[in-house]
């Protein structure tokens, strides 16, 4: 996946810069999300792989996407097809969404707890995390009984393990050393 990310980065960056310039970030995000799903669809990929030229690949892809792609989106598809990079479209969509979140000063935070968090706990957690990261926080909560108690918080490259399971593991490691 890292190779696809490397391939996708210049396309995503160019699309994002154009979207910022034109004030069409949200429509580009939706367009790339849709195109990424089409590119990752097995049947569509097989059909596109059977096309003899990049031009016919691009034309077919644009037909499949129909009205979902504006003129700039169609141009992106044509350039990517000419360079044999349509397979990287899902990664382009992911990177674009990441650039959008950074631009909007938003961060996705995954929270794992032993039991479901009530609304008041979620609000308190969001307030504390927004203060810590200086960004708007989008909370994604999940439960895992293995956590035992406490929380595991994952935000980008940051992991905060405040779970009882994590504390027990650290204690066991300390005792073994």
From Swiss-Prot:
* Assembly description: F-type ATPases have 2 components, F(1) - the catalytic core - and F(0) - the membrane proton channel. F(1) has five subunits: alpha(3), beta(3), gamma(1), delta(1), epsilon(1). F(0) has three main subunits: a(1), b(2) and c(10-14). The alpha and beta chains form an alternating ring which encloses part of the gamma chain. F(1) is attached to F(0) by a central stalk formed by the gamma and epsilon chains, while a peripheral stalk is formed by the delta and b chains.
| Similarity comment | Belongs to the ATPase delta chain family.
Membrane-crossing residue ranges in chain numbering:
none
Organism domain of life: Bacteria
Locations listed in the record? Cell inner membrane
Tell me what this protein is called.
Answer: ATP synthase subunit delta
> In UniProt terms, what function does this protein have?
F(1)F(0) ATP synthase produces ATP from ADP in the presence of a proton or sodium gradient. F-type ATPases consist of two structural domains, F(1) containing the extramembraneous catalytic core and F(0) containing the membrane proton channel, linked together by a central stalk and a peripheral stalk. During catalysis, ATP synthesis in the catalytic domain of F(1) is coupled via a rotary mechanism of the central stalk subunits to proton translocation. This protein is part of the stalk that links CF(0) to CF(1). It either transmits conformational changes from CF(0) to CF(1) or is implicated in proton conduction.
Which one Pfam family would you cite for this protein?
Answer: OSCP
Membrane topology of the entry: Peripheral membrane protein
Q: Does the keyword Cell inner membrane apply?
A: yes
Q: What is the lineage of its organism?
A: Bacteria, Pseudomonadati, Pseudomonadota, Gammaproteobacteria, Alteromonadales
């Amino acid at each position: 996946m890292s190779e696809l990310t490397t391939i996708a980065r210049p396309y995503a960056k160019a699309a994002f810069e154009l979207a910022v310039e034109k004030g069409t970030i949200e429509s580009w995000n939706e367009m790339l999300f849709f195109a990424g799903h089409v590119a990752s669809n097995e049947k569509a990929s097989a059909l596109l792989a059977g096309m003899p030229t990049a031009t016919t690949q691009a034309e077919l892809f644009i037909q499949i996407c129909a009205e979902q792609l504006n003129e700039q989106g169609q141009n992106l598809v044509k350039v990517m097809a000419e360079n044999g990079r349509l397979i990287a479209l899902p990664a382009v969509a992911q990177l674009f969404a990441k650039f959008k979140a950074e631009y909007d000063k938003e961060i996705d935070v995954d929270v794992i707890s032993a039991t479901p968090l009530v609304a008041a706990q979620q609000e308190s957690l969001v307030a504390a995390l927004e203060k810590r990261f200086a960004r708007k926080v989008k909370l994604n909560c999940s439960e895992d009984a293995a956590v035992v108690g406490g929380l595991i918080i994952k935000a980008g490259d940051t992991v905060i393990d405040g779970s009882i399971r994590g504390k027990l593991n650290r204690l066991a490691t300390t005792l073994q050393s």
